[in-house]
Amino acid sequence: MRLAIHGYGATGHYVHELAPDAVVAVIDKTKTAEQVPSYGTLAEMTESVDAIIDFSHPSLLPDLLAYGIKTKTPLVIATTGFSEAELQTIRDASTQIPIFQSYNMSFGIAMMQQLLKTLVPLAGAFDIELLEKHHNQKVDAPSGTAELLLRTIQDLRDVQPVYERESTREKREPNEIGMHSMRGGTIFGEHEVLFAGVDELIEIKHTALSKKVFASGAIKAAEALIQKSAGLYTLETLYTQEDSHVIN
């Protein structure tokens, strides 16, 4: 497998560290790799690759999708902070090439989604709250993974997200789900779903201890994706070995 890394920050470096023989090019405007050719843009890259792993920035999405479509290259998109309009462009592009898009590449988050699918239908009498914690350099809130978990819950229960309560000063409604974000220190990522019932609590929590878990997940996604036809693939379908599907 021949890979290009699009975005050579901390997680991109870990991808290179974990798969040194597979990475044949790095694309980043400000950073270079010593062992392989480095380019400022995808258009400059001369190597042919089986897949591109993207840990860059939403502003680079148009060029990434255009390159993928032009060269028929599968894309693993792990960048966070996309708008709904940008997510729609990913969906549109996936009708032409295989795209794997997830805000969190860890196996544990896929397991957490499966646990929620089991628990949410059973916990109709419980209030649900969602808390995410990240390092003090993260700019988007709530995190993309928190939004992913929210959508998983909403597929099973009619709940509306509430992002702050100070302005309303009203009691909590049964169909609400509180979304809470904390930023500080060097927290890699922590996500917790709280089910609050009468005199009892149920908590599901995932903590990432290193960015390597995201890099490893991206490599596994690339290995699976190069065998697939056009479509938009998710972390959940990869790890549960279900058939691929396009998200409309």
Curated annotation (Swiss-Prot):
GO terms for cellular component: cytosol. One of its GO terms (biological process) is lysine biosynthetic process via diaminopimelate. The keyword NADP applies. It is found in: Cytoplasm. (S)-2,3,4,5-tetrahydrodipicolinate binds at residues 135, 144-145. Its EC number is 1.17.1.8. CDD domains: DHDPR_N. PROSITE patterns: DAPB. The active site is at residues 134, 138. NADP(+) binds at residue 29. NAD(+) binds at residues 28, 78-80, 102-105. Belongs to the DapB family. This is 4-hydroxy-tetrahydrodipicolinate reductase.
